[in-house]
Curated annotation (Swiss-Prot):
Mg(2+) 1 binds at residue 27. The keyword Metal-binding applies. Keywords: GTP-binding, Hydrolase, Lyase, Magnesium, Manganese, Metal-binding, Multifunctional enzyme, Nucleotide-binding, Riboflavin biosynthesis, Zinc. The gene is ribBA. This is Riboflavin biosynthesis protein RibBA. GO terms for molecular function: 3,4-dihydroxy-2-butanone-4-phosphate synthase activity; GTP binding; GTP cyclohydrolase II activity; magnesium ion binding; manganese ion binding; zinc ion binding.
Length: 397
């Protein structure tokens, strides 16, 4: 049904059109997408004939500034905040509406010598300003077009057109599948593009290294930042972990209430202390402390979830009541830090199969799962039972 991002990139590099939709939900809509660098009148004509939507040109903000493309409106009230600029035609065109003249306008947007005065306003091409960070910041077709152009190594500008059915209604995923088959077009999702970028790009930066004496032992501490959400993480390292021998690793998500205040609602604090103790005892290992409070929902939302648990919900139901998944954590940043430290083979201290799968997806080999089970307390018995029954944690209760 859907194609791999690599397949779509190959077609785009050949000047072909692809279809991009938000995700695999059958109610989502789709756009035709092509690279502006390879645009032709034939491609424009295909889009307006079979797509029937508005032909838009997603581009980075610095292109818009260079060409003096001001926002279409001073106050954007669009529900998706699509960043339309004023519409344009190149001054060499006549009416600007034909496929040939629209292709000319697109090509002239890429001309490095073009300036704002080279375009008439309004016109028949609709530039869109993509957010910096692309689909990792805004999961829209605008950002997808610019990201795909960058991944293809061309000018970071795309051409998109919404796909509308012959009866005038929006084409949904089942309709898009038929269109893709009819014209032998690759179809991808923005969801998969996000995953592709997370997997293939590096977002972590090593910022500072210190020696950190603790009550558990002395560790080499390295602080990291990441460009996705600007959160700061820290790795505590014991011994030489750059060899080929498997390394004992604990990826620990921040829990202020458990780690610092000793909350009995969870087993986070005891797990943290036990992991540091075990790493110190073995003389070699890594504890990666990730700022993912409350399984990724943040401190205040975790407290709100606790409040709902006091009213009878379990930890998963509380998250869902607040509008969050049961577990919002993404292990990609943690995996990149571990790879930056030179790790390849891990003996992972965890009870969570999802954590194993999350790290293995980033080419880290988990050679052994090392259980990290703490004594059950009356206050956290229900919490731990829910982790077993609903989150699949491997605990003997």
């Amino acid at each position: 049904m859907f194609h791999r991002i690599e397949e779509a990139l190959e077609d785009l590099k050949q000047g072909k059109v692809i279809i991009v939709c938000d995700d695999k939900n059958r109610e989502n809509e789709g756009d035709f997408l092509a690279l502006a660098e390879y645009i032709t009148p034939e491609t424009i004509n295909f889009m307006i004939t079979h797509g029937r939507g508005l032909v838009c040109v997603p581009l980075p903000e610095h292109y818009a500034k260079r060409l003096q493309l001001e926002p279409m409106v001073s106050q954007n009230t669009d529900s998706h905040h699509t960043a339309f600029t004023v519409s344009i035609d190149h001054i060499s065109t006549t009416t600007g509406i034909s496929a040939h003249e629209r292709a000319t306008t697109v090509r002239e947007l890429l001309n490095p010598s073009s300036k704002g005065s080279d375009f008439n306003r309004p016109g028949h091409i609709f530039p869109l300003i993509a957010k910096d960070g692309g689909v990792l910041r805004r999961a829209g077709h605008t950002e997808a077009a610019v990201d795909l152009a960058k991944l293809c190594g061309t000018e970071p500008v795309g051409v998109i057109c919404e796909i509308i059915k012959e009866d005038g209604t929006m084409a949904r995923v089942p309709d898009l599948i038929q269109v893709a088959k009819q014209f032998d077009i690759k179809m991808i999702t923005i969801e998969d593009l996000i995953a592709y970028r997370r997997h293939h790009e590096t977002f972590v930066t090593k910022e500072v290294e210190i020696t950190l004496p603790t009550e558990f032992g002395t560790f080499h501490a390295i602080g990291y930042t990441n460009s996705l959400d600007q959160k700061e993480h820290i790795a505590l390292i014991k011994g030489d972990v750059s060899t080929d021998e498997p390394v004992l690793v604990r990826v620990h998500s921040e829990c202020l209430t458990g780690d610092v205040f000793g909350s009995c609602r969870c087993d986070c604090g005891p797990q943290l202390h036990a992991a540091l103790t075990q790493i110190e005892r073995e003389g070699r290992g890594v504890l990666l402390y990730m700022r993912q409070e409350g399984r990724g929902i943040g401190l205040l939302n975790k407290l709100r979830a606790y409040k709902l648990q006091e009213e009878g919900l379990d930890t998963v139901e509380a998250n869902e009541k607040l509008g969050f998944p049961a577990d919002l954590r993404d292990y990609g940043i943690g995996a990149q830090i571990l790879k930056d430290l030179g790790l390849q083979k891990l003996r992972l201290l965890t009870n969570n199969p999802r954590k194993i799968a999350g790290l293995q997806g980033y080419e880290l080999e988990i050679v052994e799962r090392v259980p990290l089970q703490m004594p059950t307390k009356q206050e956290n018995k229900t919490y731990l039972q829910t982790k077993v029954t609903k989150l699949g944690h491997l605990l003997n209760l």
